[in-house]
């Protein structure tokens, strides 16, 4: 997949900006606060229907304006052109058009423009809350598996209904009967999600080991998927997983009624990352943690290509300030051999095959 052009208006601190990246590596450079990251976020909007630094569309609307727009053009590896337009106004909410047709559901667009990001805030994948790691795995899988995305959305709806029932003040007999129905629905969907996640992590970890060979330390990486199955983690048979979930919910029933929330399921799962069998979050340095995340992102690019047949666009925000020159340089060179890479930095990074775009110069040329 390749971004051919993008035009943004009233987005973050940009009144109007037009950008055409190169086919390989493009370096967007400029002073801090000049709006480099905003360009990447606009691209991310067109790929995944939201920015990568937050889910509130209003945050991206330039102060004092009533509407932001993004217009973009992409070309797939098979030469198929796709035009994506985004418009947001607090009065009309967000609208997304793909090839001039308005999306009825944003989720239907996920996977059309595969995209991998590396941003400073994503270190929370390594050392943040479990929800950050679940977001990583869900965003990855949803870009190539539409059934998983559908199951995930269904699971969230059932979970919301189940939690509402657990919190209700209705007749206990009604709650007990309705809870059984919702639990059966939740178990069926949870099983599908867990199976896909387990298979993803198994293959992803294998690929991560291959990618990690270029890291100077040469450590052995591994990822452990912690699900609600407890000591039954190694189960891969659907009926057995469903049985374990049912037993788990039966055991937790009184506790769930007391706490008024669902206490088991994919929404409570987590990932643990290891180097040489030592947990990264506890024992690795910041540099080692960053290098691990970089390796994960490089692995994800290859994984999505293998799973979907389309090379993702790679967006690297402030890469050179987060990593040493050897690691960052190797990352860019490796990714660039496979697809389009767009990087932001404060200084100009020149080299063979690198296109450069100065945000400061562009803004100066637009000033009256």
From Swiss-Prot:
The RecF protein is involved in DNA metabolism; it is required for DNA replication and normal SOS inducibility. RecF binds preferentially to single-stranded, linear DNA. It also seems to bind ATP. The gene is recF. GO terms for biological process: DNA replication; DNA synthesis involved in DNA repair; double-strand break repair; SOS response. Keywords: ATP-binding, Cytoplasm, DNA damage, DNA repair, DNA replication, DNA-binding, Nucleotide-binding, SOS response. Belongs to the RecF family. ATP binds at residues 30-37. One of its GO terms (cellular component) is cytoplasm. SUPFAM superfamilies: P-loop containing nucleoside triphosphate hydrolases. InterPro entries: DNA-binding_RecF (IPR001238), DNA-binding_RecF_CS (IPR018078), P-loop_NTPase (IPR027417), Rad50/SbcC_AAA (IPR038729), RecF_2 (IPR042174). The lineage of its organism: Bacteria, Pseudomonadati, Chlorobiota, Chlorobiia, Chlorobiales. GO terms for molecular function: ATP binding; ATP hydrolysis activity; single-stranded DNA binding. This is DNA replication and repair protein RecF. It is found in: Cytoplasm. PANTHER family: DNA REPLICATION AND REPAIR PROTEIN RECF.
């Amino acid at each position: 997949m390749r971004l051919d052009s993008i035009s943004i208006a009233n987005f973050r601190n940009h009144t109007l900006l037009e950008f055409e990246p190169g086919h390989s590596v493009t370096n967007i450079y400029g002073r801090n606060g000049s709006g480099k990251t905003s360009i990447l976020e606009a691209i991310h909007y067109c790929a995944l229907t939201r920015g990568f630094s937050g889910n509130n569309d209003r945050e991206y609307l330039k102060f004092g304006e009533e509407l932001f727009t993004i217009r973009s053009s992409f070309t797939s590896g098979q030469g198929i052109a796709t035009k994506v337009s985004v418009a947001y106004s607090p009065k009309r909410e967000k609208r997304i058009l793909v090839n001039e047709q308005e999306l009825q559901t944003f989720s239907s667009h996920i996977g059309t423009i595969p995209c991998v990001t590396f941003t400073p805030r994503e270190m929370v994948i390594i050392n943040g809350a479990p929800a950050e790691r679940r977001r990583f795995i869900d965003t990855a899988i949803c870009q190539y598996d539409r059934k998983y995305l559908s199951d995930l959305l269904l699971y969230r709806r059932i979970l919301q209904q189940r939690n509402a029932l657990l919190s209700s003040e209705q007749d206990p007999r009604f709650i007990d009967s309705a809870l059984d129905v919702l639990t059966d629905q939740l178990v069926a969907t949870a099983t599908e999600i867990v199976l896909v996640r387990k298979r993803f992590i198994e293959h992803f970890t294998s690929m991560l080991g291959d990618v990690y060979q270029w890291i100077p330390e040469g450590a052995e990486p591994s990822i452990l998927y912690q699900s609600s199955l407890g000591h039954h983690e190694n189960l891969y048979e659907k009926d057995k997983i469903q049985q374990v979930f049912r037993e788990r919910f039966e055991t937790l029933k009184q506790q769930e009624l007391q706490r008024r929330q669902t206490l088991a399921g994919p929404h409570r799962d987590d990932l643990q990352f290891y180097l040489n069998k030592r947990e990264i979050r506890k024992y690795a340095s910041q540099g080692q943690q960053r290098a691990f995340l970089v390796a994960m992102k490089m692995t994800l690019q290859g994984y999505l290509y293998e799973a979907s047949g389309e090379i993702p666009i790679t967006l690297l925000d402030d890469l050179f300030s987060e990593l040493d020159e050897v690691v960052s340089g190797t990352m860019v060179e490796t990714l660039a051999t496979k697809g389009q890479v767009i990087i932001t930095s404060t200084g100009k990074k020149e080299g063979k095959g690198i296109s450069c775009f100065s945000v400061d110069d562009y803004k100066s040329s637009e000033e009256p």
